[in-house]
Amino acid sequence: MKTCKEKALEWNVSPRSVNDMCKKGRIQGAIKEKGSWLIPDDSPKPMDGRVSNGKYIKKNMVAKAEVKPLPIGISDYVRAQEEYYYVDKTLLIKEFLDQKPLVSLFTRSRRFGKTLNMDMLRVFFEISDKNTSKYFADKNIWQCGEEYRSHQGKYPVIFLTFKDVKFDTWDATIDKIRGLLQEEYGRHQELLNSDKLSQYEKKYFTKIISATANEVELTSSLERLSKMLASHYDKAPVIIIDEYDTPIQEGYSKDFYDEIIGFMRNFFSGAFKDNKNLSYGFLTGILRIAQESIFGGLNNLTVNSVMDEEYDSFFGFTESEVKAMLSYYGVSDKEEELKDWYDGYLFGSEEIYNPWSVINYISKGCLPQAYWVNTGKNEILDDVLRVATDDITERLYDLLQGERVVARIDQNVVYRSLAEDPADIYSLLLVAGYLKTPKKELQADGSYLCEVSIPNREIAAVYKSEILSHFLQTGAITRTTANKIAESLYANDYKKLQSAIGEYMDKSISFFDGGAEGFYHGLMLGLIALMDNQYKIKSNRESGDGRFDVSLIPREKRYPGIILELKWKEKLSDVELEKWSNEALKQIGELRYDSEMKEDGITEILKFGIAFSGKKVCVRTE
């Protein structure tokens, strides 16, 4: 038997935590002698911190010594499938070989397994001195027959990932690309000793590997390396480019878009357009850049996006994969919670879970929160939101209320066009992972007319932190003011509320001058950003008659219900404005806005009548 202190050292937790687990009966075999807990030597650490009894080990759960950790941040295929819990996606290889497109582009949002899948393709196809078939012998692809196994280890491979090419200047960006090419050429130093390469080719190879090649020479580096590999191995290589659009996003945001587009156009053209030294090509990214902007004339490019049926189950986790994972870790009882938070994406016709969030959720003791929000910031989003119209602002509010919005989705987005046409925001939000398409119809021009909605609770939280923060910072409503409004509502302090709204109006002159609707949009977004966790927010706008009511229905009975009746009219005196606010307050009672809350058993209901005229505001409460 061991003491709590000894077990704490073994489990890397505090003695107090072990003592608490013993008290709650979560450690099997623990006994209390003379005021201290004693624990069996072989007692395993409980995995789920919220399981409340000693029978926490599920029937199908493997013993602790056999449980593999989850691959958080692991994009190395060999390591992932050897050392970690690996969700088998090798049938992607079969689907590809059944169709054999010459060049494939996969577009998915960040953290959906793109890099891991591309490294899997590299390991599968690449010629190696080692026996790499062992990394696939127990995988699904190996059971598909010799016609697929015969491709394993038979091709030279060029592999580049641009996922970390994130710099503020073009000079720094091209230096990083030069370094990546130096590393990739370094993986193929056998070419320097090849009797099938000319001295001229070896001289060029040396310039790349010594990082002395200029920008023009770098543009032909993929094409020339593919030719050298094909000559040496008598087999055209496979070229894999992961996260191809990361430096393009940076170029757009940091004002070197022309330089990066010019470079990439030549770089990819040499590699993929009419290259007889290419067996197959793969690219991944977030956005599908219009072909005329970077893949000009590349007629052999097959694009697979979230709208397509092909490959729909290979990026992200399917429902059956998630159920198997939950069972493996003994937390099948968390299925509904996990589904509510991280399910809801639709890739083609397949329902998909966010893989990054799922593995973080399980590894963090099944604690539901927005894990994906911290994985990167899409600066393009800020650029689009900066020119968002009132209509788009209102639709974002509707989305946050759980409604569906009809939008045109154009997958052929050119970065530079985003700011010119704010309606493209929906296309961007979809491919970036912020929306799903429950319903879609293909149009004659190749775009889709879709019903879009927020996939799950995590993305609702992401909207508030990433998207709504833009409005909180750029004219709709300041975060400080939004906090004051929320606090004054909770406290039923009409004077403080009047002051906060007045401050908001003073600080958002241009936004407010766009019309009264703009004021309400900003106010509603601010309320949602700060109060949606505690309240379901419903609104009823009567266009044309100058009124707008808002009901904040508490999600838990311990919070008061809140009803706002807002009215506006031009050119009112202070006396008239006060009368108008009292009329608004009176209307709440006359129209029985509180009936729904009372029926739900909410006894404390705060009511506010708010009137404004120009830059003046008056608030009254019961």
Where are these regions (language model features)?
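Polyanion-binding surface elements
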Residues: M1-S17
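A short, Lys/Arg-enriched interface patch at domain edges and termini
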Residues: D41-V62
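Walker A/P-loop-proximal flanking segment of P-loop NTPase domains
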Residues: A63-D129, S133-C144, L396, Y504
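Conserved P-loop NTPase mechanochemical-coupling segment
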Residues: P71-I74, V165, A172, K176-T219, ...
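P-loop NTPase motor core
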Residues: V78, D88, V123-E190
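Substrate-engagement module of ASCE P-loop NTPases
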Residues: Y185, S221-A230, E259-S279, Y593-E596
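Amphipathic alpha-helical segments of the small helical/lid subdomains adjacent to P-loop NTPase cores
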Residues: S293-G296, N304-I362, R395
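Extended alpha-helical interface modules used as scaffolds for assembling large macromolecular complexes
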Residues: L301, Y353-R592, R620-E622
